[in-house]
Amino acid sequence: MILLENGVRVFPKPGMGKDIYIGLANFGFENDVPELLGVAHLLEHILISFDYTRFVANASTARTYMSFWCRALRAEDYLAALETAVSWFFARGALRTDFSRVRIRNYVRELENEYYFRNEVFHCMDILTFLGGGDLYNGGRLSMLEQLDAVRELLGKRMRRLAGPNVVIFVRELSPAALALLERSFGTLPRFPSTIPATRLGSIHNKAVLVPAPFYALLIQVDNTVENVLAVICLAESYHFVDYETLGERLYVSFAFVHEQDCEAFLRNVGELRFEPAPRVELNYSDDYVMNLYVNFPWLQHDLADYLYTLNADCVPLLRGLEENLRRSVRERQLVVVYPSFSPSLFNSRDRQDHRLLVLDVDLARSAGPARVPRTFRRQPRAEVFVRYGDPALLDYVAFALARPRAAALRRLPRGVRLAHGFSHADMHEIMASETFIKYSRSRPAALFQYIFLAFFATGRSIAEILERREALVSFDARRCVNRLVFAKRARYDVVTKSSFVCGVLRGPRLSEAALTRAMWELKRKGLLYSLEHTRMHAKHTFYVFAFSIYPEQVYRYFARWQLVSKHCCVVSMRGEREDYSALRKEVVVNFV
């Protein structure tokens, strides 16, 4: 590690898949709670900008931090990738604090589309932030348009809070030119922020929360010490369902359970709690996990590998200390219990966006009962499973990967998906067969619409036939379908579903994946969507496209008028309580020969 004079920490990471990775501690959306929810996420969207023909980049905003990364598509553009990332924060050698010329309205519309996308496909439920005084979703909504002047002022104030000790930078190759670039940019930040916000996060004590969730969970507050953090790192290498969360200066250890009785058993037997360490701690963590450690715990001033000896030599004492801390916290009711619930009518609380949930006080006296050893899911050697697109279980595997992204890595291939994981076969089967997980994976059916209409355009089945089997993912491979698409004079079909989206088939002699990528970024800049998915069809220069959007009419008009599209057949879905597919007529759209 190289420590710049102002406290910025720079780590060379030769094996990293990114060229540069920047983490900003104490810069997440929990800072919005006393001010205006959504400012942090809006700032992230405004800052990141890049040439997608030369680079791949992304950014994220979490509760306590922000992170940004960039990677060049060609090796000769490595230094340019670093310069691009630096330009997000510095312009002409000075920190960016003036946002008077930024078209904030379009960015806010993009945030609303992202909320809609995440709410349709996932359940956006940030329980700790809600209990601390925020909302269940804190990424920004259209209501920010009502306070544009205040938003611009807050964006500048937020940037002026950047300070050297809160910045962590990973670089794949730390050349003299790269180091000089970082020194004359991030190295010029002050050691202390110009303003220190009065973050007002309420205390959380003895709560049970019922929300849509794939697992039962316990969030137990422990002392935020280096010993407890190292103990959690030890546990994470042994157990799948152990992790941590931070809220301000507080540290929570999280435990997830497949079955309710295992969650109850953990609380009943916490006095006899004994964790089993891994034979050897290897620190085989992703770049994202390591970055999250540094930005969540700014007092980590050494390379993580420097703690490797301590993690192995003192793992057992570290775990014993954490166990005692957990017992004390349970006795003092410093915990949150999460129970999965999928009933929209069962609630007694709501946030400012009208998200509803049930919040109760925990009554541990009711937990008295016979001892039971909680079911543990220990990590196994890395394994892979391949699931074809026609397999009815595909949706379950996808839902599993989305629910546990750190434990399972999903990769889309031409004929199916490959899931890399560290579970035993019995453990994975038990999780996917559990009643709670099944309810969770079926509770957000909007993700299926992409495949429902892909099947409609690429197979011989009618919409009625496809809808009868919507719970089983489409059993076909679009690349193998040789049906000839015949575009009718009527190029648009209006339907009513539970979601708002645009999808269909586009054809044009110059249409390509690169062109669709350019279209996605143009639509994002206009604030019309968050993401555009596309699938190459069998016919030449023909693509199936799909996009969730709260502005489906504008997205459709863009594709209908796009010069690269010579023919199109689109479905525009408006949101409604009763689904109506009556406008779709297979024989009009597709002729199978």
UniProtKB/Swiss-Prot annotation:
<feature type="active site">
    <location>
        <position position="44"/>
    </location>
</feature>
<keyword id="KW-0482">Metalloprotease</keyword>
<dbReference type="InterPro" id="IPR005072">
    <property type="entry name" value="Peptidase_M44"/>
</dbReference>
<keyword id="KW-0479">Metal-binding</keyword>
<dbReference type="GO" id="GO:0008270">
    <property type="term" value="F:zinc ion binding"/>
</dbReference>
<dbReference type="Pfam" id="PF03410">
    <property type="entry name" value="Peptidase_M44"/>
</dbReference>
<feature type="binding site">
    <location>
        <position position="45"/>
    </location>
    <ligand>
        <name>Zn(2+)</name>
    </ligand>
</feature>
<feature type="binding site">
    <location>
        <position position="41"/>
    </location>
    <ligand>
        <name>Zn(2+)</name>
    </ligand>
</feature>
<keyword id="KW-0862">Zinc</keyword>
<dbReference type="GO" id="GO:0019058">
    <property type="term" value="P:viral life cycle"/>
</dbReference>
<keyword id="KW-0645">Protease</keyword>
<protein>
    <recommendedName>
        <fullName>Probable metalloendopeptidase G1-type</fullName>
        <ecNumber>3.4.24.-</ecNumber>
    </recommendedName>
</protein>
<dbReference type="InterPro" id="IPR011249">
    <property type="entry name" value="Metalloenz_LuxS/M16"/>
</dbReference>
<comment type="similarity">
    <text>Belongs to the peptidase M44 family.</text>
</comment>
<dbReference type="GO" id="GO:0004222">
    <property type="term" value="F:metalloendopeptidase activity"/>
</dbReference>
<comment type="function">
    <text>Seems to be involved in viral proteins maturation by cleavage at Ala-Gly-|-Xaa motifs.</text>
</comment>
<keyword id="KW-0378">Hydrolase</keyword>
<dbReference type="GO" id="GO:0006508">
    <property type="term" value="P:proteolysis"/>
</dbReference>
